[in-house]
Amino acid sequence: VTTPLTFSFANRAYKTVYEQTLRLLGVNESVVQAHQGMLENMLGLIHGRVYYNINNWYRGLLFLPSFKQNKSDMERMMGLTDPVDLVEDQALTTKQKIKKIPQVIRALYSMFTRFRNMDKLVHEFRQMFQGEYQSVKRESLHTLTIGQLVNESRRLDKQLLENWTTPIVNDFYVMMMNGRVHRWLEKVGIENPEVVQNNLLSGEEGIESTEPTKMLLRMCDYIRNNKALEASVLSNENSVLLNVIQTQDAEFYQQCQTYIELYGDRTMGELKLESITLRQDSSFMFAVLKNFLAKSDLTLATLAENEAKFRQEAEDTVMPLVRAQLGRRALGKFNKDLSALRDAIRNRENMRLARTRMFGLYRDIYSEIGEQLSFYGKLDEPRDVFYLTLEEIYAYNDGRGVQTHLQSLVAARKEEFAGYKSHDLPHHFWTKGAVYCNNTFEYPHKGDENVDFDASHLVGTGCYPGIVEEKIRLIFSPDDELNLNGQILCTVRTDPGWAPLFPTAGGIIVERGSTLSHSAVVARELGIPAIVGVPELTKILQDQEIIRMNGITGTIERLDSAVESALTEMSEAS
């Protein structure tokens, strides 16, 4: 469940960023203003869950040529399991087509100019972000008034959100190049184009998403070489370890502080403002280090020893086929497209760390506002601020709020959102008319009536090769048991903050996502067998049951005889 502050912030951010992107593509200001309804509704909040309003994403694609192809590419990138066709390509008259030519030319010129200069733009974006990031003195936020904190938030809106177009344009580039490479593979008759394409994308160096994991592995090596420190790490609770280490090993304590300073905002659920990060609680960092210590063979040297092998095998399969069937010139074009896709994915993953840190800055600002509102008796506790919307915080500061008794508003919201935690919603559904009026949000099935709990085989999309036979560990939050020790990590979705858990997993299976989602990219970088897009995965599989997963075919076979007894117990309980 996502809190009102996170949703209202994300919704405003999407509007701001995509509005600037339309302007960058040369769309006339009058047209941008005419599409405010679309821009304000890129996201939806249903029973506390954030959804894409996919029709408005389709409408955004209408600003680009080749709607059908771009629609298909976007669906593949997002991992949509049931695309819809409520938004169709526009059938224009000759006069309308002529009138639209200048806009199309501006969009194409702007887009492809940026595609050609993407590395330079990414470098400039990262420099810009680093300057703004360092301008915020996080350790001094407590010295600012509520008004000054609101002004700082608005300043970041102007300096960051209104200059976030490079990541969006690069996402378009990823979408288009991924579709283009996929069509190349289909053209030469590759039997499993998704699998081969995943292997072609593996072994990519310079992906910053894996740097936190690699730094933790170096820290783990330091612990292994210091037996007294290792004994302390293994014998103390995660919540007190930072204080224990401070008095025991100054050098390692500094390593911990450096990690928190660099990657303290990178945590599970990092795109929720209400998430507790390493800056507030370092427990997750030590849980990961203990996981690493439990696997004596886990080092940087052994982390991804098979990556180059799978990539080379895929290249040895594809390159001769392309040349034999399409010629040497086509092979050159294919190599160029593949290289562009690899670069675009690397750039996307590296810019995502900037997104993580941006959320961290806003999180600290709003948390301090909560501290002060609590101090002045306007909220019962500081974290109640996450049950206000961004506009309500701004309006309270500006003197235009329609409800100034904040705590009664928070109490009603907390009760409502607590009830949402027990709601089980599908990953997509249709609505008709007013969204919150008479819509059941039960598409494509109602409840669990069509979920086959007895299924012996499940199928998703393979992301990285390997056959693993092991117990599964269902993990949904940092509060769950995180000790994997070779077990298969199963969850609904992941974000970049999950990456440190991956090296100790025997395999990774994610209910939602695509071959371009973060879990797939990092699994390829770390060389871990992975499957994504498995419908109802976490409803069907039971924690600790034994399965066999195939990262090539995307198949999952249930092996544990205990499954039958677990199912019997569930049936008797119901």
Walk through the language-model features, giving the residues of each.
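Acidic, glycine-rich flexible loop/linker segments
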Residues: 1, 472-488, 492-574
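Contiguous hydrophobic, helix-prone segments at protein termini
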Residues: 4-457
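Residue-level recognition of conserved structural "scaffold" positions that shape functional pockets
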Residues: 55, 384, 437-440, 467-469, ...
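A residue-level detector for conformationally permissive "hinge/kink" positions
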Residues: 346, 369, 425, 452-458, ...
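Surface-exposed loop/turn and secondary-structure junction residues enriched for glycine/proline
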Residues: 348, 361, 381-382, 388-399, ...
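Mature hydrolase/peptidase catalytic cores and their serpin-fold inhibitory cores, especially
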Residues: 424-486, 490-500, 508
